[in-house]
Amino acid sequence: MTRPDPHTSGNHRTAGTPEVPERLDITRATLDDWAVISGWAAEEGWNPGLADARSFFAQDPDGFFVGRIDGEPVSAISVVNYGDDYAFLGFYLVRSDLRGRGYGIATWKAGLAHAGGRTVGLDGVPAQQDNYRKSGFELAHTTVRYAGVPQAPRPAEGDPAPGTVIPVSEAGGLKSIALYDSACYPAERPRFLASWLAGDGHRALARVVDGRVTGYGVIRPGRETFRVGPLFADTPQGARALFDALLATVGRAPVAVDVPESNPAAVALAEAYGLTPGFATARMYTGPVRPFAQERIFGITTFELG
């Protein structure tokens, strides 16, 4: 997710903004650096997963940048590459007491350079859409975080949909899940999934019909609540079966799921469980992305990596 302060990104092309402000040193970040940046994200209310960073770095360890003044972190951004055609931007942050000094835009430029000629996606707060457009991003859809203690929904009408929800390890493992995921995301991401499905505290389940994977989901502990993502399924009934099973693994504790408003069935699912809409983000891209099954997306993976 990106939630830059307006002073750091209010106009990406402001005359007089230095390319790199004096004393700012922008370098690639380490996992230890990212523990600090994740703390900033938590302060912004993003509720990052407790073990997210390791999976993020597994996809592209060179895609994380930190700006320092006298050795102290003051700014950050991630631009994670997926193959040759797609990248995703997140964690665009400047330390709250140092905003308005040009550190944000300098870090932004350093991060975007890592993407090369790839199409870049991001999830940014709607208030910053005009700023992102100035850097070539165009709106695709809005995503809303739904959160709360899940309530038991009314029973679904009609006969139960066929299928079984099982651990992903019993559903063909990484190979089967990566194949299904590739139809639901703008790029293939097996390195990320290998870590995400097996992350500390992560519970990953698949829905199988006649031996074929028809959806999968992951729930993981966050700083404030459990986080569900991704939640991908062929049908609303399948998504509901997966969501129920994921919730059961944490005793129906408070959860959050990031729901694309471009899929009305996903919104209906979150509302059926009594979850409350919170802040929204704008999914934006700098260019075309390969077609993917947006109707299968009932919860995105993360705001930070798409």
Predicted regions: what they are:
Residues 35, 137-227, 237:
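Amide-forming acyltransferase catalytic core, primarily the GNAT-like/NAT-type
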Residues 81, 119-123, 138-152, 277-289:
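Conserved catalytic-core motifs of GNAT/GCN5-like acyltransferases
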Residues 94, 100-113, 236-248, 268:
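Conserved acetyl-CoA-binding loop-helix of GNAT-fold acetyltransferases
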Residues 114-126, 251-261, 281:
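Conserved GNAT acetyl-CoA-binding A-motif
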Residues 131-137, 270:
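Conserved active-site tyrosine of GNAT-family acetyltransferases
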